[in-house]
Amino acid sequence: MSLLVVGLNHRTAPTSLLEQASVSGDDTPKVLHDLAAAAHVNEAVVLSTCNRTEIYADVETFHGGVADISDQLSRISGIDLGDLAGHLYVHHDARAVGHLFSVVCGLDSMLVGESQILGQVRGAFRTGQSAGVAGSALSGLFQAALRVGKRAHSETSIDAAGASIVAVGIRLAASSLGILSEVPAVPVAPPGGVAGELGGAAVLAAPVAEPPPLAGARVLLIGAGAVGSLAAQTARRAGATEIVIANRTPARAARVAEMHDGRAVGLTDLPHEILMADLVISSTGATGLVVDHDLVAAALPGRGGRPLVFLDLALPHDIDPGVRALPGVSLIDLEALRVALDGAQVAHDVEAVRALVSTEVAGFLDRRRAGRVAPTVVALRAHADSVVHGELARLHSRLPDLDDREWELVEGAVRRVVDKLLHAPTVRVQQLAGAPGGDSYAEALRELFDLPREVPAVVSAPDLDLVERS
């Protein structure tokens, strides 16, 4: 049995495919039970957000588990497995642990450091438990991951990494629009301090200079994920008069619009909304351009010469770089933000969390290896106790004249000899279990003492035909 994660995210798949592969809350229990019924899957948890759909599982075999989970993702998305496979990534055992720990800390998010993912992982785990599909193997993994996530968000300033990008982007955009009056800034909280709210989950606001306000500005946000929600929050606090949320999925646009007192529209409304907007912030994660040169050029004649600023927070770009050549149009992209942002501090925070994740992964794997040896030690002692019991019974029948005191001494001596013989190897195998390759010592004990094969065996990662992709 081993840990496995198979999934797709904003780095490996376009938004349209992510939407097809997403699993709603109502559908999750059925998906979980379908996974549990698969031949090679013992336990499962489904994590489905705007930017990822991942299935974490404890599986009997690597290849069988990958096949079962990939088939399930194909059924969910309605996409032929041959077409879907190129967008999937697979992580096994240690890399699966490291991936989950990175995800829950926000390192793998489109908005680095966002803490909304912590609540989403917790919810996915609880759903798996409620469905009876997340057992002891995944419970230990997810409980450890949630502890790591809490540490990352309370002991470092990783929350500020992504929030800083949004805040600085809006400050630069407001400066380009020529709006310079002062309004209250987004509250700042230190690590472990009081946080604001993003999508029902705590998120620390950016500890950066107050962004110039957007008093009187109309702001159009394209994309309703974590980045779009944070941008809406920041723009609203900066004084934006009107906030419009455009998204491929109307329900998501409506949800974010309701959170930030905005208005939801579809992507087909972009020509009119660009005509009316002062600032357009885009963060869809689409693989192609969302706003091209011709769309913007067509809107300019009706704007009366008002400046128009685009803030492109997506990678790859949502906004056609060619719009920079249009009169009165400015474009701020991630490269420009990296120059304006204190990149050294952001890099320091990210590296601090990566170091934390690395340490926690090593500790988790050590504990798991040691835990896997425990059943073997228990089986060995049970085997020894059975042998002692049988031999004492045989001895008792041959020495019926021994009184209770004499028999107690004989039994005690036999048990002490057996305990002393077993003490050194059982203690040593537990010590060695935490080291790489330590599983082999438990296997040796099972072979030498012919212990029952139902004792969980440790299967180390083989040379895999399927390359693990990030």
From Swiss-Prot:
Q: What is its EC number?
A: 1.2.1.70
The reaction(s) this protein catalyses: (S)-4-amino-5-oxopentanoate + tRNA(Glu) + NADP(+) = L-glutamyl-tRNA(Glu) + NADPH + H(+)
Q: Which PROSITE patterns match?
A: GLUTR
Q: Give the residues the record marks as binding NADP(+).
A: 223-228
Show the InterPro entries listed in the entry. 4pyrrol_synth_GluRdtase (IPR000343), 4pyrrol_synth_GluRdtase_dimer (IPR015896), 4pyrrol_synth_GluRdtase_N (IPR015895), GluRdtase_CS (IPR018214), GluRdtase_dimer_dom_sf (IPR036453), GluRdtase_N_sf (IPR036343), NAD(P)-bd_dom_sf (IPR036291), Shikm_DH/Glu-tRNA_Rdtase (IPR006151)
Residues involved in substrate binding: 49-52, 109, 114-116, 120
What is the UniProt domain comment for this protein?
Possesses an unusual extended V-shaped dimeric structure with each monomer consisting of three distinct domains arranged along a curved 'spinal' alpha-helix. The N-terminal catalytic domain specifically recognizes the glutamate moiety of the substrate. The second domain is the NADPH-binding domain, and the third C-terminal domain is responsible for dimerization.
Role description: Catalyzes the NADPH-dependent reduction of glutamyl-tRNA(Glu) to glutamate 1-semialdehyde (GSA).
Per its record, how is this protein called by name?
Glutamyl-tRNA reductase
